Amino acid sequence: MEKIFQNVEIKPFLIDFSNPFIKNAAKRLFQLEEQLPLVPVNVVMDFKGISRAAVHGLSRVLQDEIPNYMLDIKPGGYKIEDSTDLFMTEQFIRNRINFIPIYAKNETLVFALRSLNNSCEVKTIYSRDLIQVAGPKLKYPIFNPTFEIGFLQPGKSLIIEDIYIKKGIGRKHAAFNLAVKTHFSHLDIEQYPTDKKEYMALSGYKQSSMTSDPRHHRLGLCFPAVPLPHINQAVRTYLKNACRIIIGRIQSIQKIYENFEEPQPELVLFSLDEEKTKAIITIKDETHTIGNLLKTCIYEMIPDISFVGYQCVPHKQEMVLTIIHKASQEDLITLLEKSIQNIIQTFQILEKNVDELIA
């Protein structure tokens, strides 16, 4: 297979200190005379030779299906009895703290917020006001000091203890999203000029991506908190981790049909007639990301297949894949294995390309 990862543009969002207004504001508000320790990084990547489903899968995993961290308040951490500003409700403050972008590797860190407004004006509480109260001493900040958390009226106070680092994935809570603003387009489908009505009324493409089978794609996204000295290293790690997660999730499906001749609840195989076989595979804790990827790859590997489809069952937290094909049970499992191996190979090559392209 040829090189999949064709090109990448990594562009950090830096403060423009050449602008006097921005320079003065940064110094006045945050005593900043140099760049923030963490920066948002826009990444644009070009891929060639893979399906729309593969790019969509990578996009989904990078955004909300890869483990990441957020700040949260432990039960009882919001000290209502010690806080005198009743307008700053717990849920309001919790949401603001949750959505502070962080770059964390140590879950033992604990922070606190102990703020008192002794002035005659409304005081803005920033993330810089969070103080570390537990865990190893930080060599490098895990969040920027510039995010607004709340406001204090004159003479009022706000006390929060036990602000800890929580691990999760974005599809459970948006604050865990590793990447934001993900979007992708197809470079090998002719588009309408942007000034034409057709561009605004439809998708912008002259042919649907569902029928044209595009193989050249551009994926864009933003990582909101990346250490300034290690931008390329962090981006490379994120992309490789996403590939490994997809490979791992696909490999877990292999275990379901390894012993297909033995009865098991996750796999139902039976003959519809003398020629066709139907397979129903139940995959726990799986999403549309893998379902769409499997469906597309199976179609590509078996163009004359009778049917392949999937359904996510949210209340059971499972995905059900259904395949009908004119083949014996053994042959159907063999074809499924070839499709699985094709997906694994694609993302193994992509992971290798990431190392080659991002130094």
UniProtKB/Swiss-Prot annotation:
Induction context: Expressed in the early phase of the viral replicative cycle.
Any one cellular-component term (Gene Ontology): DNA-directed RNA polymerase complex
Pfam families: RNA_pol_L_2 (PF13656)
Cell membrane among keywords: no
Subcellular location: Host cytoplasm; Virion
Keyword terms of this UniProt record: DNA-directed RNA polymerase, Early protein, Host cytoplasm, Transcription, Viral transcription, Virion
SUPFAM superfamilies: Insert subdomain of RNA polymerase alpha subunit, RBP11-like subunits of RNA polymerase
One record GO biological process: DNA-templated transcription
Molecular functions per Gene Ontology: protein dimerization activity
Family stated for the protein in its record: In the N-terminal section; belongs to the archaeal RpoD/eukaryotic RPB3 RNA polymerase subunit family.
Quaternary state and interactors: Part of the viral DNA-directed RNA polymerase that consists of 8 polII-like subunits (RPB1, RPB2, RPB3, RPB5, RPB6, RPB7, RPB9, RPB10), a capping enzyme and a termination factor.
Function (record text): Component of the DNA-directed RNA polymerase (RNAP) that catalyzes the transcription in the cytoplasm of viral DNA into RNA using the four ribonucleoside triphosphates as substrates.
Name the UniProt record assigns to this protein: DNA-directed RNA polymerase RPB3-11 homolog
